[in-house]
């Protein structure tokens, strides 16, 4: 059995977390039979993250790194690390210490039991705000309803993959990446481990509300075309209702009945205008995804590396 584990950690403005997470990983794996190396991916940080990584690498042979030319986003930074990984066992996790390194031995134990992918599911605790719990559950419920895959609420980008599954994952040509969905989509033998997220060690979250919303839209648009059918069905339903209203208008015209309700007509027109704009927005999102895919630009650019 190959006992080398490669841990891929994307980092954006995590200067003070870099030495902390490395120390925690070192402690977690000290009593195992595995050797490890840590691949940090500096995702265009503007603080001293790259310097902290380089300093760690200069003093530890098992620390390697990639520095991207700008901030390409968490999923693309993960891809950069996965593309460069060479070990038969790869673990991906975040640098903020909310993915506990102490869980790594449990991931490896499940791998030894024959699982190709060991993913983690976050248990809600006091470190997770009510709004985040509610919006996350709403997203996963909607995602599972609309798509052909099922992602458990609380799923995280903290997982172990063997080389077979990682090679399959890297075959995916998606320009906009949603790894939580892609890992489920490729199949293979998978199992989960639950964990309680810790409080962020230092710094602030890099996922703003805007980024989280875009992440959710990417996930749904990547794995489901049901919103397009929803737009078509709604248009068809309103067309039927409009047709059913025509006989009444004809009857009123020939019977001399005055039809009142200008306010309701204006409100109805405004309502339908909103519906039309919403439908155009749904179609526009899918067209935008196709446009991004057709450009075929690289998902990241490397400024410096030590591998």
Cite the ranges covered by each PLM segment.
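Residue-level recognition of specific faces of alpha-helices
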Residues: 38, 52, 62, 68, ...
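Residue-level signature of catalytic and energy-coupling elements of molecular machines
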Residues: 25, 81, 96, 118, ...
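Acceptor/aglycone-binding surface of glycosyltransferases and processive sugar-polymer synthases
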Residues: 68-70, 74-84, 101-179, 198-217
């Amino acid at each position: 059995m190959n006992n080398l584990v490669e841990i891929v950690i994307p980092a954006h403005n995590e200067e003070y977390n870099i030495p902390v997470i490395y120390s925690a990983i070192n402690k977690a794996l000290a009593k195992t039979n595995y050797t490890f190396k840590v691949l940090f991916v500096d995702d265009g940080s503007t603080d001293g993250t790259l310097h902290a990584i380089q300093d760690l690498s200069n003093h530890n042979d098992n620390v390697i790194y990639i520095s991207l030319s700008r901030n390409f986003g968490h999923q693309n930074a993960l891809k950069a690390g996965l593309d460069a990984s060479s070990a038969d066992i790869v673990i991906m996790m975040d640098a903020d210490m909310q993915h506990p390194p102490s869980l790594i031995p449990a991931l490896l134990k499940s791998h030894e039991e024959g699982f190709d992918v060991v993913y983690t599911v976050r248990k809600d605790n006091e470190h997770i705000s009510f709004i985040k719990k509610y919006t996350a559950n709403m997203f996963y419920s909607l995602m599972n309803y609309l798509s052909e895959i099922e992602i458990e609420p609380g799923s995280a980008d903290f997982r172990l993959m063997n080389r077979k599954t990682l090679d399959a994952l890297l075959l995916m040509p998606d320009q906009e990446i949603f790894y939580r969905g892609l890992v489920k989509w490729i199949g293979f033998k998978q199992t989960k481990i639950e964990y309680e997220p810790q409080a962020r060690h230092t710094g602030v979250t890099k996922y703003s509300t805007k980024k989280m919303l875009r992440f959710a839209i990417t996930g749904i648009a990547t794995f489901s075309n049901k919103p397009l059918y929803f737009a078509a069905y709604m248009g068809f339903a309103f067309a039927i209702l409009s047709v059913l209203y025509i006989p009444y208008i004809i009857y009123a015209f020939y019977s001399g009945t005055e039809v009142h309700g200008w306010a309701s007509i204006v409100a109805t027109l405004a309502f339908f205008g909103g519906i039309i704009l919403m439908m155009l927005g749904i179609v526009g999102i899918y067209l935008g995804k196709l446009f991004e895919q057709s450009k075929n630009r690289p998902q990241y650019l490397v400024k410096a590396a030590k591998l």
